[in-house]
Amino acid sequence: MKVYIETMGCAMNSRDSEHLLSELSKLDYKETNDPKIADLILINTCSVREKPERKLFSEIGQFAKIKKPNAKIGVCGCTASHMGADILKKAPSVSFVLGARNVSKISQVIHKEKAVEVAIDYDESAYAFEFFEKKAQIRSLLNISIGCDKKCAYCIVPHTRGKEISIPMDLILKEAEKLANNGTKELMLLGQNVNNYGVRFSSEHAKVDFSDLLDKLSEIQGIERIRFTSPHPLHMNDGFLERFAKNPKVCKSIHMPLQSGSSAVLKMMRRGYSKEWFLNRVERLKALVPEVGISTDIIVGFPNESDKDFEDTMEVLEKVRFDTLYSFIYSPRPFTEAGAWKERVPLEVSYSRLERLQNRHKEILEEKAKLEVGKTHVVLVENRREMDNQIVGFEGRSDTGKFIEVTCKEKRNPGELVKVEIISHSKGRLIAAIKGN
């Protein structure tokens, strides 16, 4: 039998899709890229913003038209968690609904017509699953926690993924070793608040923290690089930043989700820190790792965001000069504090602010790219670049998270670490040549 999976949203959903495949493989399901021949079609959904949620029902309609007569459609993930049986009412072609915390139950629900499994209680089977043998990957995703205990006013995740729980370290290390044996060179650790690891386990566990986990993972032979997402700025204390700086296998790029540069808006968002506190953490980090790459998330148009609040955000953008920016207009979500507020920033104002923010960030990237010319980086080869069946180079990322295109005629295999020198740039893109010894 064949299964087709459509994955929407974040890296956590991508990992959940791997979990679904792992469970279904026990029932002899094989993945296919063609929904027309699938016996089972799964849509793994995102509900962080409204747009992907609207897209879900469009996708269901399209799949219902092209699927085999007896094929089943299942909706999984975060939208499944918060909409539950309402999905079945709105889309009768859906056979079952499976929440984000219930992926391990897929083998049960596919045999139950109109089943709804969306509980967000603790469940070790939500993360303890057999390693899914697949084509070797240079970069692999690895969950270290599930759920979230934060109460950000705009975020639906605690409602869809439940309370935060750390995965036992021995299970993480075992999975990482399997990934390394399967060819993985770079791990991407996943969690809603990865650097809060160790605060709660589902059973008795030795006291450990995120830095302890990073140190243990660094000892695994074959793993060359470790990245993680998404950390919370509140847990970036001096001890964590110092150990982050010292560990040679931990990539010197980090996600620091700002959300807003206004202390007033941050307070309304229930983020737990101020603009000044955030900038202090950045200053400390750059003192330890001057070349660190920093990415961030910014929401514009949050309820009651004034012109002054937005200017504060622009000020932080100028001071930090983020290497990567994920920016969005505020999207009201159900089951959130802010979703019930009546105050709204006019949509045209939000679009104007977003455009200004993104345009300035593009300029910053170009300014930073100019300064990279002549600098040396070590790139993990991800893909070869070919033209007319001839090798023209490769592409990959530096330790600091910079995406680099390398021009060369030599064959370099994915997974190799290669020293390169930046020779030019174009619209923020970095172009390099192999650095001689």
Swiss-Prot record:
Keyword match Transcription: no
Cofactor: [4Fe-4S] cluster
Location of the TRAM domain: 370-436
A UniProt-annotated Pfam family: UPF0004
GO MF entries: 4 iron, 4 sulfur cluster binding; metal ion binding; N6-isopentenyladenosine methylthiotransferase activity
Cofactor descriptive note: Binds 2 [4Fe-4S] clusters. One cluster is coordinated with 3 cysteines and an exchangeable S-adenosyl-L-methionine.
InterPro entries named in the record: Elp3/MiaA/NifB-like_rSAM, Methylthiotransferase, Methylthiotransferase_CS, Methylthiotransferase_N, Methylthiotransferase_N_sf, MiaB_methiolase, rSAM, rSAM_horseshoe
Sequence positions that bind [4Fe-4S] cluster 1: C10, C46, C78
Binding sites annotated in the UniProt record for [4Fe-4S] cluster 2: C148, C152, C155
Gene Ontology annotations for the cellular component aspect, listed alphabetically: cytosol
CDD domains registered for this protein in UniProt: Radical_SAM
Domain Radical SAM core, residue spans: 134-367
Compartments it resides in: Cytoplasm
Class in the EC hierarchy, top level: transferase
Endpoints of the signal sequence: none
Reaction equations catalysed: N(6)-dimethylallyladenosine(37) in tRNA + (sulfur carrier)-SH + AH2 + 2 S-adenosyl-L-methionine = 2-methylsulfanyl-N(6)-dimethylallyladenosine(37) in tRNA + (sulfur carrier)-H + 5'-deoxyadenosine + L-methionine + A + S-adenosyl-L-homocysteine + 2 H(+)
Function: Catalyzes the methylthiolation of N6-(dimethylallyl)adenosine (i(6)A), leading to the formation of 2-methylthio-N6-(dimethylallyl)adenosine (ms(2)i(6)A) at position 37 in tRNAs that read codons beginning with uridine.
Quaternary structure annotation from Swiss-Prot or TrEMBL: Monomer.
Sequence similarity: Belongs to the methylthiotransferase family. MiaB subfamily.
HAMAP family: tRNA_metthiotr_MiaB
Name under which the protein is recorded: tRNA-2-methylthio-N(6)-dimethylallyladenosine synthase
Designated gene of the protein: miaB
